[in-house]
Amino acid sequence: AKHQSAYETLKLPYLFEDVAIVLKRELTWIPLWGMYPPAMGMIPIDRGSAKVAMKSILKGAERILNEEHRPLLIFPQGTRTAVGEQRKYKIGIARIYEKVNRPVVPVALNSGLYWGKNKFWKRSGCVTLKFLPPIQPGLDQKAFMERLETAIETESQMLLAKPELTEDA
């Protein structure tokens, strides 16, 4: 999924039963809250070491998808990205795609219009999450990455161009 704000980290898990999330390890250091991701079988990663991060992502994804048969949520840009900011998609999603041989469902959204990256104040409006057609297994990494990024970015731009505002916005 696109990752523009904290909104989708709260909403997307609510939409799926027993979803696991790939998240930065630093979130597990938050007092009290930090004990929940490991207890819920999430995949915390050390973003300081690409090699260690990739190893834990692949091991965790295989466990979640093939052994536990749970959905996995990953933000392929690796971090929150402000509306209008360009950030490269990380190769980790393609490696997961190859390793687990499962369809990937891209998710476009416009949450950054109303709850910006690192913003305290929120704006009124209707956040839209759009689940796009699955990308079936079998593509090589380059073709998969191109299809994923094109799908998410194209649809997200359309959602950003036509925001649905509430009456009080």
Segments from the language model and where they lie:
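Non-catalytic C-terminal accessory region of glycerolipid acyltransferases
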Residues: Y14, M54-A169
